[in-house]
Amino acid sequence: MAKNIQAIRGMNDYLPGETAIWQRIEGTLKNVLGSYGYSEIRLPIVEQTPLFKRAIGEVTDVVEKEMYTFEDLNGDSLTLRPEGTAGCVRAGIEHGLLYNQEQRLWYIGPMFRHERPQKGRYRQFHQLGCEVFGLQGPDIDAELIMLTARWWRALGISEHVTLELNSIGSLEARANYRDALVAFLEQHKEKLDEDCKRRMYTNPLRVLDSKNPEVQALLNDAPALGDYLDEESREHFAGLCKLLESAGIAYTVNQRLVRGLDYYNRTVFEWVTNSLGSQGTVCAGGRYDGLVEQLGGRATPAVGFAMGLERLVLLVQAVNPEFKADPIVDIYLVASGADTQSAAMALAERLRDELQGVKLMTNHGGGNFKKQFARADKWGARVAVVLGESEVTNGTAVVKDLRSGEQTAVAQDSVAAHLRTLLG
């Protein structure tokens, strides 16, 4: 017997029972995006490798250790996208969407990183990202955060996420802070773990992200990034905080929040939760005013974020049990008798025409009434429409409310109207 081929470790199948809840959550997210005037952009999952090296940074963990990179048949180095911002910027430059224009874009789809798989962290994972181009004030930063807060309210998880904010300033301010931080770390090198020693010279701000308790204790005495901010970044951050306070959005300033990708400047933020164990970041982003120019476009202010959908689904399921998947089927059409199947299928097509958006399944494979009603129950139907030989002859159908058990004989021409009343 041939050996079964299984999914690659860290790349998961999502089965019908799971995709139903994903679809409802995604529908909620998309409705909110539409209410803010954001437009979808669809991007390739494979890009040229230099795009990510230039955008993310050569000495980041993502580029050094996590990218799925391969050579194609033409000898070109290609990479499965590890994040969405770089590809969105590339598309904006390539298609002339950015220069002297405002764009509010969103995308959704799989990303790929070669990490150690664990709950909430996978090698193929899904993100929804938003990117805004052409606006440089703190007001658009605030709008993005307000948009995410509206998502949490719609999903019933507001009480389980908290907002952390920071400003990492301009490139020049960050360079000055980098020098001060390296000088401090060199004085305490013996207290650093091997990972932090490596990062100290390649990407020292990432030491602030260390999960090592001893390093965290050491960092209490480290120089504060806020003390090195340029005046323009201070004013920008103060403006953002004031707007969030006016909107009633609570936040905590976390001066160790730096983000893991090199392209960020000024505003950075994360929505975090205590309900998912170690994988606490649900949504994160910030401003990246230099990235468009860095990738070959003209200087364009930009800000955005990405949200991990696997973690969001886990969080919704953990803290909001009332958030259920929509039923697969609203109506199940039961047909019994030698000559009823063609009539049942014709009625089903007519009902689909008249009841837009209603999910109707016709019984196939025969079976007595008991078996067919069991199938209706399995698919979550609220109503059964029953056709037997006598109903076909009389031009009627029996409509049965599967919750109350009440049933009514209705002329076939009136079935759609009766169903509208039952389904609300």
Curated annotation (Swiss-Prot):
**A single cellular component GO annotation:** cytoplasm
Keyword field contains Zinc: no
Q: Which GO terms describe its biological process?
A: histidyl-tRNA aminoacylation
**Principal subcellular localisation of the protein:** cytoplasm
> Gene behind this chain?
hisS
Asked if the keyword Ligase belongs to this entry, the reply reads yes
The record's comment on protein family reads:
Belongs to the class-II aminoacyl-tRNA synthetase family.
Q: How does it assemble?
A: Homodimer.
**One Pfam family from the UniProt entry?**
tRNA-synt_His
Single GO term (MF): histidine-tRNA ligase activity
InterPro entries in UniProt: aa-tRNA-synth_II, aa-tRNA-synth_II/BPL/LPL, Anticodon-bd, Anticodon-bd_dom_sf, His-tRNA-ligase, HisRS-like_core, HisRS/HisZ, HisRS_anticodon
In Swiss-Prot or TrEMBL terms, this protein is called Histidine--tRNA ligase
Q: Where is it located?
A: Cytoplasm
Which catalytic reaction applies to this protein?
tRNA(His) + L-histidine + ATP = L-histidyl-tRNA(His) + AMP + diphosphate + H(+)
Q: Which organism is it from?
A: Shigella boydii serotype 4 (strain Sb227)
Enzyme type, top EC level: ligase
Which E.C. number(s) belong to this protein?
6.1.1.21
Q: Which UniProt keywords apply?
A: Aminoacyl-tRNA synthetase, ATP-binding, Cytoplasm, Ligase, Nucleotide-binding, Protein biosynthesis
